[in-house]
Amino acid sequence: MDTELEFEQILCYDLLTKAATTHEETTETNLPDYCATASRILDASGLLLVREKQPAEGMIRGEVRVSILYLSEETEGLQSVTVMVPFSCELSDPKLRECQMLQVHSRLLLCEAKLITGRKLYLRVIPELTVLGFGRKTLRLCCGAEGKGLQLRQKKQQLSLLSMVEERSCNTAQEFDIGPNGAEEILLNQVLPRVTSSQQIGSKLVIKGEIDISALIRTSDRKLQGIVQTVPFSQILDGITVPDESTIQVETTPMEWDLRLLRGEGGCRMGLTARITLQVFAYRRQEVCYITDLYSTCCTMKTQVEAVSVTQRGRPVCVREWAEELLESGRGSLFAYVTSFDCGSAITRCDSGRAELSATVRMRILYQDENEAPVTAERSREIRAGIEGCPDTVWLGSGLPELRSNAGRCQVRIPVCFYGCTGETTELQTVCAVEEVTEEDPQPRPSIVLRRPRPGECLWNIAKEHSSSEEAIRQCNHLEDDTLPEGMLLIPVLKA
């Protein structure tokens, strides 16, 4: 007798690996001809931009955008120059080769600039990269069987799966007014994109978002001014089919950008061109029905059962906190600008099904003293947050700093988001193979068996032992459900 098993293959994705690495780059560079000769470096800040990710080779390539603020004896006011320091990192984790998409969370452990001469600089940067590798997995479950006299034991299970990951990039260009402020030069700038909505329309994914822009400018009278602006962006991603009833989450990071002044008769404008990385994650709940055991009333069968490991994942949980700092001055007004900030790495403590997270936020603030000379100060604040559950992966994100000046005080607030991603492993015991066993000396079987259920025995095990069926035992004993009586049980033996 031939027994045919039917299998269902479920395609999903999972976090296959997590790797971290640090890398040091040093370089020497000359100031461009249009820059004034430097006499003293006031501040050096860096932004890490990942341009290329190659999972098959385990390579991460990008640049550190180093912006240097300095003073010059040749001219008044604060000067700046931006230098791109390329880097490449090779990760040795072999599981990265199995990944289809890499998500990189980066920070700079060190960014420093020193003067060799008035026109030559020494730069040193140490980026830290935390790489999450997402790869494809196939779940193979036995969902049916055909054969004479087969009795099937089935089970239903609700699964939360990461059903799709996809990475794309897009370009955007925007212009906006900054008013008649006599802007002369952009000294520092930073952009942070964020997605506000996403919608699946056929095979297209429509994404809308905003780009937060922060810039430090020098005006024509050599004063400093901070500019904060938000501009919209939208993108249609073609060829992306999100599984039905999925929850979509889109993460975005800047790949490169250029912010420039556009001078005209009506005032001053800024123009932004940027290239943005978009990473699409789709989560969905799916019910699966699979066979955990089977037997035949016509013959003796040997059943093989395997454990299929499923990692159930939902959308990352996000909790936002604020890192706050207060600057005070004896003057009536205080100008300040955050040149760089770092959230560090999250420390996780799990207790009673809840994770307590903490991080130290470090910020460098540029302000003007009582003589209106530019100076910098470093501050740090520890922040804490709580997340339900015990996430296996935690990372940090932040928005642009908010500054509020009033009566000789300046309050600095930096929004910090704690992200927690929890993967719960579930083992599904499912039939993977069956084999008919030939009995050398088959013994005659009775037509009915009368016995008392053993402690802990279930209806399925009794039916399987005596080549019966659960339904036949229920009918013979007038049972409404699978609850076994305390007394004797009539077990009809089904014969081919």
Region locations from a protein language model:
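Membrane-lipid interaction segments
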Residues: D2-R445
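Primarily a LysM-type cell-wall glycan-binding module
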Residues: T438-Q475, E480-A496
